[in-house]
């Protein structure tokens, strides 16, 4: 069906108002969806006209999927500002309908959101976007788009800790205290793997299948959801064999859904929690679409309600940050590996990667329940299967410790993962340092780890190449930012610092003139009852350099950072090893501001480790001893060819350029400075 650009259908105003607002008109609209869809198609305008219209004073913003084939023009999610009253979404929708009617347009209100986020879903012409964006209380509007299932018993052995591996999979518990909500296709609940373990809800919000000749064969409609339900809690092939599942159908028989249907499914979960709160809750999102601000915002709202969300990274062999819900910081995002712990390849595609991935899990040739019959099994691959593994592991961890927060759960998943087992050469070169080399595993025990100081590394997005460009990395609300570092592949950067923004501390990195951009790297830790602050020493201008101290009683140094305004600091040569008793201060270049991150917390104990080698050195590392956790990672100040410093697990990595290309002399030293901490009091108490 073709589209007609910039056409309006003029209706008598009384008739339009009767259709839009009257009860009989409302019923007529509900009974004639197909005719309405044709009308929406007829009313679509050309893309070029929208950009000019939105520049004429609209206060809200418009968003759409970056992947054109996945876009669904004519359907829009209108999101209101957070502080709006609960009644405002419906009132704003009715106001939009009335104003559109005066202009001769028909609008259909599809859904009103109250519990998940304030907003509503409408079908309307693109000609009305400018009008909608100008409405009071509107924050932004997002065009609907498609989401897709991400699937194209070594897996159970792989997630069992090496010291406990045996001929039989023996998890610490079955995850019986946890409910898992699965947003997927329908499920064959009578399969022997999951019979009696799955509650098929009455929720269903799916688009029609593509193609007029598509046959909705039951076994095909149920295949993806049935397999994943079996991976999560199947009797024979499941990870958490005691977890109960709730099935919400948001994908059609072709494994295709929409952002809006996923939103409505998430709101269904939100309402269910309000009506009848339960214990720990895990939501499995084995689907992916283009980046969606509104879907990520919805995930954030659920996470605030202590719901754990686990999502597939996507099967596009691409940066996971370009997809949703994988890009949402509050979501635990999972990539896929094979039996050799290598990234999964799916034809010309494969698992997604990058800084938005938290960890990887088994995702190739996974045996699970088949919808072909009640006793059939099938092998499937993809990041959906990987996410199902992590959802099962999360269920067991939450059963052992039901009060775990999302931040605590994520930190434990990272801490207990198998480390440095993935061949990073599979990833694009610019993504290797950003992608975590972690494969999910069960904890070796369910007790005795409460004293452990857990930390993780969070990378920012790339800053861009302009001189004043900055990058920002932030921790989760329940985490403490203990240190901040920066990295630039060109080596042209102006350092980093910790700054307070909106009541939270963030890590900022600064690009330099002629630089290609910079990353900020935050070290985010779980430190209960901590009182942290940053102490800054301004540029000294002369002498050996600047020194920033932790001068408050009982405060301990957890990280050092520095930033400068000039393009070239030059070099100076402080000693690599600090004098004994000087572990509460940071040293910096005389032309830079130096920042000491200092914390007071019960039982906190920290020490500094340094390792230096004469240049040229492509990489220098220093690692904390067992029982100690890396909280700070920095480079020797004033070394001209250093690209930056970052933490990989409990190892501080400093990267540098070849001195032959920089004009520097090999007399310079490349040094990595690590600050290692532990919670001594809690360790003794445990």
UniProtKB/Swiss-Prot annotation:
The organism's taxonomic lineage, starting at the top: Eukaryota, Metazoa, Chordata, Craniata, Vertebrata
Record's function text: Crucial player in the regulation of plasma cholesterol homeostasis. Binds to low-density lipid receptor family members: low density lipoprotein receptor (LDLR), very low density lipoprotein receptor (VLDLR), apolipoprotein E receptor (LRP1/APOER) and apolipoprotein receptor 2 (LRP8/APOER2), and promotes their degradation in intracellular acidic compartments. Acts via a non-proteolytic mechanism to enhance the degradation of the hepatic LDLR through a clathrin LDLRAP1/ARH-mediated pathway.
PTM comment, free text: Cleavage by furin and PCSK5 generates a truncated inactive protein that is unable to induce LDLR degradation. Undergoes autocatalytic cleavage in the endoplasmic reticulum to release the propeptide from the N-terminus and the cleavage of the propeptide is strictly required for its maturation and activation. The cleaved propeptide however remains associated with the catalytic domain through non-covalent interactions, preventing potential substrates from accessing its active site. As a result, it is secreted from cells as a propeptide-containing, enzymatically inactive protein.
Cofactor(s) this protein cannot do without: Ca(2+)
Organism, scientific name: Saguinus labiatus (Red-chested mustached tamarin)
Designated gene of the protein: PCSK9
Domain Inhibitor I9 as annotated: residue spans: 75-147
Protein's name in the database: Proprotein convertase subtilisin/kexin type 9
GO-annotated biological processes: apoptotic process; cholesterol metabolic process; low-density lipoprotein particle receptor catabolic process; proteolysis; regulation of neuron apoptotic process
Broad class of the protein's primary localization: cytoplasm
Subunit structure as annotated in this protein's UniProt entry: Monomer. Can self-associate to form dimers and higher multimers which may have increased LDLR degrading activity. The precursor protein but not the mature protein may form multimers. Interacts with APOB, VLDLR, LRP8/APOER2 and BACE1. The full-length immature form (pro-PCSK9) interacts with SCNN1A, SCNN1B and SCNN1G. The pro-PCSK9 form (via C-terminal domain) interacts with LDLR. Interacts (via the C-terminal domain) with ANXA2 (via repeat Annexin 1); the interaction inhibits the degradation of LDLR.
Domain notes: The C-terminal domain (CRD) is essential for the LDLR-binding and degrading activities. The catalytic domain is responsible for mediating its self-association.
Pro-sequence residue ranges: 29-150
């Amino acid at each position: 069906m073709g589209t007609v650009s910039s056409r309006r259908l003029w209706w008598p105003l009384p008739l339009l108002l009767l259709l839009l607002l009257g009860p009989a008109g409302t019923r007529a609209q509900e009974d004639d969806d197909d005719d309405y869809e044709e009308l929406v198609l007829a009313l679509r305008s050309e893309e070029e006209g929208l950009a000019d219209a939105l520049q004429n004073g609209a206060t809200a913003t418009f968003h759409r999927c970056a992947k054109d084939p996945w876009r669904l023009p004519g359907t829009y999610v209108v999101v209101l500002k957070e502080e709006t009253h609960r009644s405002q979404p419906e009132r704003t929708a009715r106001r939009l309908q009335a104003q559109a009617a005066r202009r001769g347009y028909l609008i259909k209100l599809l859904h009103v959101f109250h519990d998940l986020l304030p907003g509503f879903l409408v079908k309307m012409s693109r000609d009305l976007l400018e009008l909608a964006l100008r409405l009071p209380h509107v924050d932004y509007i997002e065009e609907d788009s498609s989401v897709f299932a991400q699937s194209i018993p070594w897996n159970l052995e792989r997630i069992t800790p090496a010291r406990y591996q045996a001929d039989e999979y023996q998890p610490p518990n079955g995850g019986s205290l946890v409910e898992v909500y699965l947003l997927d296709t329908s499920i064959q609940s009578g399969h022997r793997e999951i019979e009696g373990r799955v509650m098929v809800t009455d929720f269903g919000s799916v688009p029609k299948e593509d193609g007029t000749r598509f046959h909705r064969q039951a076994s095909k409609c149920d295949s993806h959801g049935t397999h994943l339900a079996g991976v999560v809690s199947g009797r024979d092939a499941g990870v958490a064999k005691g977890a109960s599942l709730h099935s919400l159908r948001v994908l059609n028989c072709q494994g295709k859904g929409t952002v809006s249907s996923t939103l409505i499914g998430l709101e269904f979960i939100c309402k269910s929690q309000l009506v009848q709160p339960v214990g720990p809750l895990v939501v499995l999102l084995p689907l992916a679409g283009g980046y969606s601000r509104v879907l990520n915002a919805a995930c954030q709202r659920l996470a605030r309600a202590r719901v754990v969300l686990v999502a597939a990274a996507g099967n596009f062999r691409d940066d996971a940050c370009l997809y949703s819900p994988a890009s949402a910081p509050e979501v635990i995002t999972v990539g896929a590996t094979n039996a050799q712990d290598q990234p999964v390849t799916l034809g010309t595609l494969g698992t997604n990667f990058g800084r938005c991935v938290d960890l990887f899990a088994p995702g190739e040739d996974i045996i699970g329940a088949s919808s072909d019959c009640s006793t059939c099994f099938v092998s499937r691959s993809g990041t959906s299967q990987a996410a199902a593994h992590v959802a099962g592991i999360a269920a067991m961890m939450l059963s052992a410790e039901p009060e775990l927060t999302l931040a605590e759960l994520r930190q434990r998943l990272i801490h207990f993962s198998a480390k440095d087992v993935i061949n990073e050469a599979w990833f694009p070169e610019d993504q290797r340092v950003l992608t975590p080399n972690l494969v999910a595993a069960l904890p070796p025990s369910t007790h005795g780890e409460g004293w452990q100081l857990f930390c993780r590394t969070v990378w920012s997005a790339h800053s861009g190449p302009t001189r004043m460009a900055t990058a920002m990395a932030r921790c989760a609300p329940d985490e403490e930012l203990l240190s901040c570092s920066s990295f630039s592949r060109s080596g042209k950067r102006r350092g980093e610092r910790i700054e307070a923004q909106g009541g939270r501390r963030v890590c900022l990195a600064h690009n330099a003139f002629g630089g290609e951009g910079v990353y900020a790297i935050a070290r985010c830790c779980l430190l209960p009852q901590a009182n942290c602050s940053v102490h800054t020493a301004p540029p000294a201008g002369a002498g050996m350099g600047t020194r920033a101290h932790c001068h408050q009683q009982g405060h301990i140094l957890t990280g050092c950072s520095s930033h400068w305004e000039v393009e070239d600091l030059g070099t100076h040569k402080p000693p690599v090893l600090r004098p004994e008793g000087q572990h509460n201060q940071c040293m910096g270049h005389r032309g830079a501001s130096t920042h000491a991150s200092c914390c007071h917390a019960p039982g906190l104990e920290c020490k500094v480790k340094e390792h230096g080698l004469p240049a040229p050195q492509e990489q220098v590392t220093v690692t904390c001893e067992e029982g100690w956790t890396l909280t700070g990672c920095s480079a020797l100040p004033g070394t001209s060819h250093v690209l930056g410093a970052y933490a990989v697990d409990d190892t501080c990595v400093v990267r540098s350029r070849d001195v032959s290309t920089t004009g520097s002399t090999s007399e310079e030293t490349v040094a990595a400075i690590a600050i290692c901490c532990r919670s001594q009091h809690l360790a003794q108490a445990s």
